[in-house]
């Protein structure tokens, strides 16, 4: 009898887990044989949080997350009570997966005295916290708050400092001896400045710097410390391009809804002592490095960002640029074989290219250093590097904004004729290159702008006739640029727009900013779409921005373009209310107010559609805003005033003030003449009436009798 085959999902899952475990063990064995675990990584155990404590702190974290406090005082009182409950347990809380989130929230909301107390608790254990998976994140948040406190201490006067700290020192002075002793100890701890505490922590971490460089968690703490010591901007922990956290950490923070406070995304004033500490940090890190080890770290997945940062800031304290000259050779006009091999690896490796791009973009390296590497190893193969869509092309993009103008124009001269071939629509490659080419051209005074436009039309709308655009009935421009087929457009499952869709939409918006011909091409493509498909675009989270950015009117609009604009506006007819009540579509309806300038009939059509379903529009949160922005109350009650709004918009578009005279149209001249004649007739009628009234008055009062003329000089 054959072997019985196990069936069912559980059995399959069990087999899969077993296979994964075996693979992981074999991989771990290989890694252990290659890399030995550093012996100086602290691994202090601070204890476990029991189940009852976890429940309490978990509930407290949830309460802070909801933030349902009526006042700040109520929230501060809650934070004080939680900190009091956590007193003496802080270290085991920050190393716990659940409770570390609570400690991070408490640090974000804590006041200066509470932060100082936490600082004292962490003192002596910073190394252990920096190397731990969970506490390292808490420590990063804590360091940002500490940097803000240091700046506060530097900027406030002694009177402010004493006013904020003296009361607590003196309030229990006359109580029993034990209480007095406690207050005095607290007073002494408060006298210690945050700068002193911070420097103690910096010294505590010095023995571990070489290990922190390539450690999965401690390296992030080290990067943040270097930024603070150098007085550089401390980036957000959630933005996609942040240098503060790893990609996984940024995603996790968004999922658990931990938001940064106002202390992030800014630089802080630092005391002079920090420059000395930064110099010592860099000396400790570089003293045991040789060229081979420095290059290994620069292409190490974890250590590479640390070395990028050191190269960026070492010029502040080291005129010799020690680390730069460890990684790259000294200034020379000839190629160095070992350096040439290393640069070639940087240009072809994903981690290496990130490192190379970073040191070019940042202001740390001297321009002559970058120019030397470019001329020796890259200038003669710019096009070849631009074809490396995942590595070398990013180096070329960075160089276009760092080299001298003549070198930038040389790169543009090589790439622009091949731009259409370099962009891959199917693989979504080199769209960023096209954007950077456009930016570099604009900076250089629209250098070869027409050639760039021709190449972009050749790639994204090859059948579009620039000389006769109205003959186009294709949607190839939108399809090639946005890849509508297979996108989330029209999905009923509430799918989030993808990152690729965002990149493509931003690229198309860049094209429309570059030249108005891309906008006209977009109009024609919108009109070629089925109306239902176009309405779906207007209500899509990403593609709606493309439609919105296409609603642009030129100052000196030719007649044929105005006719095309009218045709484009016709496809909105019958869908205005639907769009007005949608979160994305409402922005488009708002934009139609400006897009219908000099087309009052189309304005009336939109307003009539909104008026026809006024109740539905007003009941919608988004519709209310559209109703207000279109001045619909005036349309409903004071049509004449609404027309004045339209007139004011037209004058503003033309740049004509109300006091500035402009050439009048024939109909306006005729109306002015009629008004003048009517005014003159009215004045003559008023004068005649006044004469008649005067004569009547004279007759009634007897003043109308003729006076006898008296001749001679004396007529009394």
UniProtKB/Swiss-Prot annotation:
Residues 22-38 have a biased composition (Polar residues). InterPro entries: ARM-like (IPR011989), ARM-type_fold (IPR016024), NOP9 (IPR040000), Pumilio_RNA-bd_rpt (IPR001313). It is found in: Nucleus, Nucleolus. Residues 1-11 have a biased composition (Basic residues). The keyword Ligase does not apply. The keyword Ligase does not apply. GO terms for cellular component: 90S preribosome; nucleolus; preribosome, small subunit precursor; small-subunit processome. Disulfide bonds: none annotated. This is Nucleolar protein 9.
